[in-house]
Amino acid sequence: MFTVYGKSDSGNCYKVKLALEQLSLPYRWVEIDSTRGETRTESFLSMNPNGKVPTAALEDGSFLPESNAILHYLAEGSPLLPADRLGRARVLQWMFFEQYSHEPYIAVARSILRYLPPDSPRRA
């Protein structure tokens, strides 16, 4: 069975979960708390040496990290990924935009609001 190692409040993990639900694919979710060092254990690093979530355990026993790589893997052969070359390129265009031009700002703002105390000078 497809297994996702992820953190429920992570946007990158959420989009993988959303794709799995949209495709009605069975999966197992393993909650990993990166704030408690769970991505730095020997066991986790053997799956993903970068120590990041999400990481997917594929049916053949291999591991696939990075949310957009997982999304592309899941979408292959499904209605989520167009059959034509330009359509697939446009999907990748949006995935690159989301990951590199949009997500960094959202993730930083969310982390500041969620993890820094209200009186922290770093919140300014």
Identify the residue ranges that each predicted region occupies.
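GST-like domain detector, emphasizing the conserved glutathione-binding G-site
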Residues: 1-9, 14-123
